[in-house]
Amino acid sequence: EPHPIMIAHGLSHLIPFEHEDLQKWESSLHFGLSPQHFNTIHSETNLCFGGGLDDVWQNQETGQLHIVDYKSTAQLGKEPRQLNESFLNDKWKAAYKRQMEMYQWIMRKKGFDVSSKGYFLYVDGQHINKAGMIDKDQPSKAYMEFNTSIIPYDGRDDWVEDALFNIKELLLNENPPEHAEDCEYAKFLRETQSALKN
């Protein structure tokens, strides 16, 4: 049956998906190579491509599956932004969308009927006008209040296969590519090299 959060967001037609391998799919820290884990072998490149799902919901009307990704935030501004589709527009959140699309692609490769509509279930830690998180009577306990929101996202996974070919080509290349100017890893490496020289 639908979880109360699904009902509260007008998604009572969705229910948690049940599958014997779901726990393995959710275990990204134990990424396994067996077909029971959340991965697929891309036969054209022989790359094992996978990760760890947060959740999968099933549409009771169509039978289609919806990938669900859990996200958390704690907005520090006095006027926090609403958690809606526009909340996903920050440049760095493009990675969230790519992850959703990759997981949709993997589920399809595993033979499931997957909707292009996925959901980001956001929790937003509340701090404005809050006395604090630590329980005064039991200081070994802390509590935090969260607002919740479900943000729909229409994914497009048509880029994934080309990306896998590009990854394979890069792995076989004897020379690494140059870092992009805004690459955080490149900045880190440059600063590390500079610090080591001094």
Where are the model-predicted features located?
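Metal-dependent nuclease catalytic cores that hydrolyze phosphodiester bonds in DNA/RNA
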Residues: E1-E61, T192-N198
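Short, charged/polar micro-motifs that form catalytic or ligand-binding hotspots
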Residues: H42, N46, S86-K97, N173-P176
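Metal-dependent nuclease catalytic cores in nucleic-acid-processing enzymes
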Residues: L88-G118
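Metal-dependent nuclease catalytic regions and adjoining charged, substrate-binding loops involved
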Residues: I106-N198
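Residue-level signal for well-ordered alpha-helical scaffold segments within enzymatic catalytic domains
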Residues: A8, D55, H66, M102-K109, ...
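Short histidine-centered catalytic/ligand-binding loop motif
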Residues: L76-A94, T148-Y153
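Short, mixed charged/polar active-site loops
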Residues: C48-G50, G63-L65, K141-T148
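Conserved catalytic cores of phosphodiester-cleaving nucleases, focusing on short active-site segments
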Residues: G51-S86, Y103
